[in-house]
Every structure is written in C-alpha cells, then in structure tokens.
Amino acid sequence: MEITVSEIQVESKDETRSAEVRPQDERQEEKASMLCFKRRKKAAKAMKPKASSKAADAAKKCPPEARASDQPQRPGGAWDSIKRLVTRRKRSESSKQQKPFKAKLQSEINAEDANPSKKKAKSRLKIPCIKFSKGEKRSNHSKIIEDSDRSVKVQEAENLVTKTQTQSDDQATKSKSPQDVREDVSQKGDDEVCESNVNNSITSPGEKVISVELELDMGHSAIQRGTLILEKDTEMLEEKQSIQPQHVSPLEASDTEQELPVGSEVPPSSAVPDQQILEEARNGVLESGPDWKEHESREIVVEESKPKDTELSQELDFQENEITAEKPKPEESKRMEPIAIIITDTEISEFDVKKSKNVPKPFLISIENEQVGVFANDSGFEGRTSEQYETLLIETASSLVKNAIQLSIEQLVNEMASDDNTINNRLQ
C-alpha cells in the first residue's frame, strides 16, 4: 500500500509541474523577446529589495520556464542519458558561478542605495525596472480600455435618455410634470458623466483607477434608474392617451392634463373596472339556471296578461319568493333572519295553488314553450303546472329548512364558545 501511495504522489507532482508549465509557455509566446532579457538577469531581480512583488514572481517563474524548454526536447535512448549528465554538470557549474556573482550584485546594489546619483550612469540595472514599469503601463492601459468601454455605455445610456425625451415630447407636448422630472434626471446624468470624464484623465496609478471604476459604476446605475423612470413616464402617458379619446375630445384632454395631470388618470381607470363588473354581473345573470329564465319569462307574460284575480297575484309573489330563496348563498342565508315567515308563505301558496284553477292560457303556454315545445290541451297544461309547482315547493321548503337548521346549530355553537370564553376569563 505504501508503494502505491508514493507512486501516486510522484505522478501528481509531475502533473502539477506540467500544468504549471503550459500557462507559462503561453505567456512566453505573448511577451516574446522581453523574456530573454529577464532570464539573463533573474538573479539581479530576485535580490533587489526595491523591486516589486511582480519582479519576484517573474524571477521565480523563470527557472521552470527553462525546465519546460528542456523537457519536450528529450528523446529516448542512452545518448540522451549522457546528455542529461552533461547538462546537470553544466547547471552545477553555472550555479557555483552565480553565487559569487550574486554577492557582487548585492555590493553594487548597496553602493547604489548609498549613492543615488550613480544610478543614472548605470543603465544595465535599470532595465528590469523599465520592463516592470512597462508591465504596469499595460495593466493601466487595460483598465483605461475598460473605463472607456464603460464610458461608451454611459454615452449610449445618455442617447437613450435623449431619445425617450424626444418621443415623450412628440406624444404629449403640453404635459409639464413628467417633463420636469425628465429634465432633473438628465441633469443628474450629465453631472455624473462629467465627473467620470474628469476622473478618467487621472488614471496613471492603480488606486485612482479603482476610484474611477467605482464612480463610473455609480453613474451608470444612476443613469439606468433615470431611464427606468423615463420609461415609466412614457407608459403612463401612453395609457392616458389611449383612455382619454374614448371619453373626452383631444382639446379637452390637453386642458385637463395642464390643470390636473394626476386627476385625469384616476376617473378612466375607475370607470373601466366598473364597466367590467357590470358586464360580469350581466353574464352571471344570463348564465344562471333554467329556473331564473322561467321566472323572467313568467314575469314578462304576466305583465302582458295583467290578471285581476288576487289568487294569481299571490301565486306570482310566491314564484318570486321561490327563486330568491333558491339562489341565496350560505353567507346571505345567514343574514336572512325571518326564515319562518317565508315557510309560512310557501304553505299558504301551496294551498292556493292546489285549489286555484283560474290560470291564464298565455301564462301556461310560455312555460310549455320553454320545457316541451309542443302545444296540447288545457287540461294537460293545468296538470303539468301543478306538478311543477309541487316539486318547486318541496325543493324550496327543504332548502329553507336545511338553512334554518344550519343557522340554529351555528348559533348554538357560537353561544357555547362565548360561554366557555367568559368562564375561562373569569377563572383567569
């Protein structure tokens, strides 16, 4: 088990080295001739105290680059093993030579620190500093490019703001309040863009670049908020213009916008849902059951016939009571307290309907048209109507009795609950 673990560890190390070598080779291809200089003077860079962290990283990265250049050029065979021995000896000799060279460089660096006037004459030691300053300039250049991209986005946002302003001016030239809001937003956006341009002029050090980026982000977000506000204003104006021509002429609409821009929005919006509610109520009435249709047809026929007998008037009243009693919901039935009175009306009307035979012919014909569609003798009409009345009476009476029982049970339960609450409160 130990042998396998050691083998796995070795393989992982090789893999990590190869993974480190590949991005460095890519960097070599990008920087090309600059790296040759760095390889020759890596010892000088590594020992300098004033060199930046980037210099140290580059100096550390140089030896694996050399290894990477050697590794892919190794073919197999005994000749290669001899070459490797020779290259190892050369490396050991070069490392021995580098040690006194490093000591010399340290003495020279200390002398330069003591005499800063001599730095100008020694151009060899300035080369790596120049290289690293070039690298910093490149990073600043990339940041400046990013800033320029963001400034382009800010300019595009400004163009969108101006376009929305022109569209809104064309749509509603006389609306004042939304235009004032837009002018304020556009002024804020211009101020923020000016600040970002001023800060773009100072982008040489890294800290100022970061501050410029933050300010650009804030300006961009503020301009986005402004565009959102402008889009909302345009939507409100479009809704106004779509609703007002239905009710008011264009001249009157412009006058009302000048006087009461907020009040002109409310009445059409409140009128539309009222119309929808009325239409829904009408549809609900039309979609109700056949009993309601029978009731409407009966009422129309009765208005045309206008009977003079008191018994017929009682029957019609009873029919109305039946239909209104069948429709109420449980909430409405709870509110209807005089349920017993309705039951007494049904009993009286049952007695009247059974004994009454003075029913007009058009009244019976209307019922027959809705249900059968075939005309028959008067005796058939009378028999069928009496049966229908009986069934309606039984259904209504049963529904009313059920509602009354439910209400009584609920009242008892509520009373018991209230009594329990009072007892608990007293005990507490």
Swiss-Prot record:
Comp. bias (Basic and acidic residues): 10-32, 57-68, 133-156, 171-191, 290-311
Short motif (AKAP CaM-binding): ranges: 76-96
Family annotation (Pfam families): WSK
Keywords, comma-separated and alphabetical: Calmodulin-binding, Endosome, Lipoprotein, Membrane, Palmitate, Phosphoprotein, Synapse
Essential to the intracellular anchoring function as annotated region, ranges: 1-170
Lipid bilayer topology: Lipid-anchor
One GO molecular-function entry: beta-2 adrenergic receptor binding
Ranges of compositional bias, category Polar residues: 161-170
GO annotations of cellular component type: dendrite membrane; dendritic spine; excitatory synapse; membrane raft; plasma membrane; postsynaptic density; postsynaptic recycling endosome membrane
Compositional bias (Basic residues): 37-48
Sequence segments annotated as region (Tethers NFATC2 to CRAC channels): 411-428
Tree of life domain: Eukaryota
Start and end residues of each stretch annotated as Disordered: 1-207, 237-313
Positions of post-translational Phosphoserine modification: S92, S94
Signal sequence extent: none
Compartment(s): Postsynaptic recycling endosome membrane
Keyword Transmembrane: no
Swiss-Prot/TrEMBL domain comment: RII-alpha binding site, predicted to form an amphipathic helix, could participate in protein-protein interactions with a complementary surface on the R-subunit dimer. The N-terminal region, which is highly basic, is required for interaction with calmodulin.
Function: Multivalent scaffold protein that anchors the cAMP-dependent protein kinase/PKA to cytoskeletal and/or organelle-associated proteins, targeting the signal carried by cAMP to specific intracellular effectors. Association with the beta2-adrenergic receptor (beta2-AR) not only regulates beta2-AR signaling pathway, but also the activation by PKA by switching off the beta2-AR signaling cascade.
Protein name according to UniProt: A-kinase anchor protein 5
Organismal lineage: Eukaryota, Metazoa, Chordata, Craniata, Vertebrata
